[in-house]
Swiss-Prot record:
SMART domains: WD40. InterPro entries: G-protein_beta_WD-40_rep, NLE, WD40/YVTN_repeat-like_dom_sf, WD40_repeat_CS, WD40_repeat_dom_sf, WD40_rpt, WDR12/Ytm1. This is Ribosome biogenesis protein ytm1. Keywords: Nucleus, Repeat, Ribosome biogenesis, rRNA processing, WD repeat.
Length: 487
């Protein structure tokens, strides 16, 4: 077989893309190019006046599902292909490596992070009530407090302590419901809904978090919380193995059915008076005991809010019909599942479910397939548990993960390869395109043999403002990059 090693060799390529705004005319899609050309040269060809005639858009190129990392010549040699091979190149806008932007200091571990912006879910749910330019970051900490930050790293508001209506133990999860409402949950087994208001001039804003609703039903720590501001609904996953379904409406929320769960049930009268608050106390719309081990995450279907998905340390992924509080399907995986994200797909009615595992990888599951099916893809690269996941808000094919190995990793599902024999030999595998390390560990000597010890990532969220992560280093870290998010 001939190999393209001779000087001046050329290869015929066919350019394709799935991005409508950068489609080539059909007459321009096939071209002869030098065999030794690389990504940069191909990108220049596409941007040229005779092709797309664009302002230097950086492109990456996929060949058979994998990114082209060398020259076309090297690709042909590696795959035993001759010069006569017509190579189909799918071109996509490049992701630029995310750069470190800032860190916000805390007094204790940061367990959860969320963002309020014009493009975030809560920003959209707020409608006209959200003021553009007043982006906010929400953090939850093991010290039992919520904090609201402005984009400059100033704390605008802090939740009250446990004796004044706040959480009485570490907070594990928190989300914006809107620009004026927040939900949080944690180790005190409660979900708390807060009214958030701001006052003062733009250069000296002050925020107030006032507890308005306490939700009781779980009998153990609540480790995950998901919200839908449009329907005023909340999903929770608890170490008691159950999934909670709640409303933020006091009028439609049922009374607490088990009075022993209320804070005053085992407290002296003097203690009750000292900690009494005016927040209403309500129970769940449904409490579904569907897992045989701690439930670790639950999310709404991106398109159908009457459907939810949950994962657990019992190795299962469950599809839930929220109208009947029943399990529709169960998928059993090989490992304990610790995190979950639903990735919308324009070509399918159901999302792709990304499940972070205790085995250091991410399993992608299609909930439409049979209960006997295994994962459709595996994302490998982390060196410790994967405890947080977030989809890219701008496309369907990338996500970010947070791990106890002290990193966040960005994945592109268009870049895949067959699994090797050591990886089980079945399905497809993808590897991270970028790794975000903790800035707090730069220049520090490693003190422990445990990967990620002292800098575990507990939470990550992806917004057009950037990638925000919080963890064991007591910081919220912000990373930005063109293509990864808006500049």
């Amino acid at each position: 077989m001939d190999h393209p090693t001779e000087s001046g060799a050329q290869v015929r390529v066919t350019f394709t893309t799935q991005e409508e705004d950068i489609q080539l005319d059909e007459s321009k899609r096939q071209l002869l190019v030098p065999a030794d050309i690389r990504r940069y040269g191909l990108s220049r060809i596409l941007n040229s006046e005779s092709m797309l005639d664009t302002n230097s858009i950086p492109f990456d190129f996929l060949v058979n599902g994998s990114f082209l990392r060398g020259s076309l010549e090297e690709y042909l040699n590696a795959n035993g292909l001759s010069l006569e091979t017509n190579i189909t190149l799918q071109y996509v806008r490049s992701l630029i490596p995310p750069t470190y932007e800032a860190s916000f200091e805390h007094d204790d571990w940061v367990s959860a992070v969320d963002v309020l912006s014009a493009t975030s879910p809560a920003g959209r749910w707020s409608g006209d009530n959200f003021q553009r330019g007043q982006d906010r970051i929400l953090s939850a900490s093991y010290d039992g407090l919520l904090r609201i930050w402005d984009a400059s790293g100033n704390v605008i508001g802090t939740s009250p302590s446990g004796s004044h209506g706040g959480h009485t133990a570490s907070i594990k999860a928190a989300k914006f419901l809107s620009s004026t409402q927040i939900a949080s949950a944690g180790m005190d087994r409660t979900v708390r809904v807060w009214k958030y208001t701001e006052s003062g001039e733009s250069y000296e804003r002050r925020g107030e978090l006032k507890p308005t609703l306490e939700l009781y039903g779980h009998t153990s720590s609540i480790d995950s919380l998901e919200v839908d501001g449009a329907s005023k609904r909340i999903l929770t996953a608890s170490a008691d193995g159950s999934i909670g379904f709640w409303t933020t409406s006091k009028a439609s929320a049922p009374e607490v059915s088990d009075s022993s769960l209320l804070p005053g049930a085992h407290t002296s009268k003097r203690r009750k008076l000292a900690t009494s608050v005016t927040a209403a106390q309500r129970g769940p719309l449904a409490l579904m005991n569907i897992h045989n081990a701690p439930a670790t995450a639950a999310v709404f279907d991106p398109r159908d809010r009457t459907v939810a998905y949950s994962v657990s340390q019992d190795h299962t992924v469950k599809t839930i019909d929220l109208t009947t509080s029943s399990v529709v399907s169960t998928f059993t995986t090989s490992h304990a599942l610790l995190s979950l994200a639903a990735l919308p797909r324009s070509s399918a009615s159901a999302p792709l479910l990304a499940c972070g595992t205790s085995a250091r990888h991410i399993t992608l599951v299609d909930p439409r397939t049979s209960t006997a099916a295994t994962s459709v893809m595996t994302l490998r690269g982390h060196a410790n548990k994967v405890v947080s996941l977030a989809a890219n808000p701008e496309n369907e094919y990338s996500l970010v993960s947070g791990s106890h190995d002290g990193t966040c990793r960005i994945w592109d599902l268009r870049s895949v390869r067959p699994a090797t024999k050591d990886e089980g030999g079945m399905g497809s595998v993808s590897e991270p395109v970028y790794v975000i390390d903790r800035e707090s560990q730069q220049g520090k000597k490693k003190k422990s043999s445990v990967t990620g010890d002292g800098c575990k990532v507990f939470s990550v969220v992806w917004d057009q403002l950037g990638i925000f992560s919080g963890g064991e280093d007591k910081k919220v870290q912000i990373n930005k990059g063109r293509g990864v998010n808006a500049e």
